[in-house]
Regions:
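A short, basic/flexible loop-to-alpha-helix module at the beginning of a structural domain
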Residues: 1-5
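N-terminal Rossmann-like FAD-binding beta1-loop-alpha1 element of flavoenzymes
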Residues: 6-32
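Conserved N-terminal/central alpha/beta ligand/cofactor-binding core
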Residues: 35-159
């Protein structure tokens, strides 16, 4: 019987935690290394929010408009196929993060609230007050802890 390879993830910020979760969900075993305790990684400083064209305010936003804003905002220097993929994936990622427990701001009706941010033409930025990065980091760390309890992840912090 072949053993499952152990995968090393270096970095306990949002990208490292997301990679760790994805690998663990696929059945892999992960050693996660972070030079600081995960909840002190620099991702905690991200404040603005995450853009996704969910069009909950009925403004006519779309993934194509999101793509156009992103390419234009980057002075047309971005590699456009990955930008298109990112814009198409963004609404589903917001939904996933919401299900993971990120306390995004809500409208009085209980829907996700979106605002304009960073030069966007539409209200497409999902946010958690002024602590979006911290809330994302804490929610993803809780998911990693769940996989730690299952024995799929071993975390090495402050090494």
């Amino acid at each position: 019987m072949a053993s499952t390879p152990k995968i090393i993830v270096v970095g306990g910020g949002l990208a490292g935690l997301a990679a760790t979760i994805k690998i663990a969900e696929a059945g892999g075993h992960v050693d996660l290394f972070s030079i600081v305790p995960v909840k002190r990684s620099h991702s905690v400083c991200a404040q603005g929010g995450i853009n996704a064209a969910k069009n909950l305010k009925g403004e006519g936003d779309s993934t194509w408009q999101h793509f156009d804003d992103t390419v234009y905002g980057g002075d047309f220097l971005a590699n456009q196929p990955p930008v298109k993929e990112m814009c198409e994936a963004a609404p589903g990622i917001i939904d996933l993060l919401d299900r993971m427990g990120v306390p995004f701001n809500r409208t009085p009706e209980g829907l996700l609230d979106f605002r304009r941010f960073g030069g966007t033409l539409y209200n497409r930025t999902a946010f958690a007050g002024a602590t979006t990065g911290q809330q994302l980091l804490y929610a993803l760390d809780e998911q990693v802890r769940r996989h730690e309890a299952d024995g799929k992840v071993k975390k090495y912090e402050a090494w």
